[in-house]
Amino acid sequence: MNAKMTIWKSTLCNLERDFPSTDRVPFFAWATGKASINDFVLPSVSCEKGNFLKISAPQRMDLPVILKTSIDSSTAYKHSRLKFRLKEVAPKCYSDIMQMIGEKEPVVLVFNKVLDTAEATVSGVITNFLIHSSIQKQIILPPHFHISRDDFRIYPQDDEARLNTHLNRLNSLKADGVKTSILPIGHKGAGKSNLMRNLVNRCLSNGYEHVYVLDCDIGQSEFTPNGCISLTKVTSPLLDKPYGHQKKTFDNSYFYGDITVNDNNIDHYMDIFERLFNKFKLISEPGSVCIVNSMGWIVDEGAEILDGIIRVIEPDLCVEIFRDQTEARYSFKEFEKCKVVEIFANNSVGVIGLPNQKKLPAPLHRELTITGYFSSLLPRPTIASFASVPPYRLNFRNITICLPMDLLVEDCHIFSSINTQLIALCVKNPDLKTRKLNGKQDMPSLSVIDSTSPALQCIGFGIIRGVNVEERSVYVVTPVNLLKLQEPPLLVRGMRIQTPSQFFTADPYNRCPYVLNLPDKSSHASANLDGLYEPSINTTQFKRSRRF
């Protein structure tokens, strides 16, 4: 459930608080009136499982979920319908609720504090993740959430009015089957990712049936672990953080292999981006909209990349968000200024009356996303249970290991260098140059990834759970069903894309999260291994320490 929520000028009936007999999940809105969450307009719905929505706004990730309610004056408020639906969801106390409501015309919402696996898992990683430490003692039963009646606006009213005008303009093109594109832009920390989710929610509420997100923010990816550029069709509102809506398998995704772009790889980045935008034009339905999630990098190489993105997609609308007037701004150059909306976002964060907590660093955001991706495999909502997840067994002969040039080691260290590592699972590409490890046919193939390597289509991620040299097997834990693949995927390592440290430290019994089964040197099996059991060496590119 959410950690905190802001409510504007509303009459709220929280059934779980006042009438504990209700038992519904996870967030539910119905009856008459009008309500929106993060600018997604909630429909008036019946009590069915498919109508539930999950919301999530952890205190440690700054912005609250914003709930706005109002009365729709165009239609008469139907207390009889409200009574019927209350009887359906709370048969033992619906009459008491109706008596409490009286002649008022509220929007009625049901909360349930049940966490899904992803949020329950990540909340166990960070102290006071869901709710502020100063109000923990006020709440008796976990998981916690807090509701505040602050008049909190992220976007100024004038800027929001201009944005709505442009969105209505694009919406008018939808009826003619025109495919449109929107490009949100913002410097680091400006709130671009939240803006992107907000645009998705607005489009879904404005009648768009086909909303796509082209996610090219390789450092803070939305639907995949970092390092990927992907195209995703969004069918439900985005009311939580990336760790909560990770896809198990990817239909249209390429593994870029790093969390940043350097001079040598801009062409590779733009090649992948153009492939996916062409894919959008090919597979999307008439009247679709594509929202591009760009990187929070608007100067130097970042500006060059944005120039390229604008040339490729020719956006129908650019939305630039900024919080700090001293930060550099993107120069739109020849782009039509009439298609640009500038938003100076609210600089305040959190809930009034609560002291600010230390902001989570970007590397930890990425680790939480990876944790959320693998959470669907866990038998219990804790990383400590990762050791119980059964892995897939892949034969040496059928796999290809791909390493970036900077992570390349001698053949005798290859298995040690990939063990316990996070790897991208990619479709085999005939243009990829490979060789057999140590020149032996019963060993894996090896490929060195450089600037000349082809773009690799990514179908998911995995963690190397173990290497058994004697049995010639690699064990991989992944949400992807490898049994349904026609051939084993490529095992591709990326730069600065690693298994979160919590996977090694969360188990209270200190069980090893990996297995490296090597033969005894005196055994007959070792005669043909040529030193492949050499001890591990450090292949980490940088040292980091953090406190949170």
Swiss-Prot record:
Entry binding sites for ATP: G186, H187, K188, G189, A190, G191, K192, S193
EC number: 2.7.1.-
Record's subcellular location: Nucleus, Nucleolus
Keyword rRNA processing: yes
GO biological process, one term: rRNA processing
Keywords from the named record: ATP-binding, Kinase, Nucleotide-binding, Nucleus, rRNA processing, Transferase
Gene Ontology terms: cellular component: nucleolus; nucleus
Enzymatic class: transferase
GO molecular function: ATP binding; polynucleotide 5'-hydroxyl-kinase activity
Top-level taxon of the source organism: Eukaryota
A Pfam family matched in the record: NOL9_C
Family matches, as InterPro entries: Clp1/Grc3, CLP1_P, P-loop_NTPase
Family, per entry: Belongs to the Clp1 family. NOL9/GRC3 subfamily.
PANTHER family, alphabetized: CLEAVAGE/POLYADENYLATION FACTOR IA SUBUNIT CLP1P (PTHR12755), POLYNUCLEOTIDE 5'-HYDROXYL-KINASE NOL9 (PTHR12755:SF3)
Function per UniProt: Polynucleotide 5'-kinase involved in rRNA processing.
Protein name: Polynucleotide 5'-hydroxyl-kinase nol-9
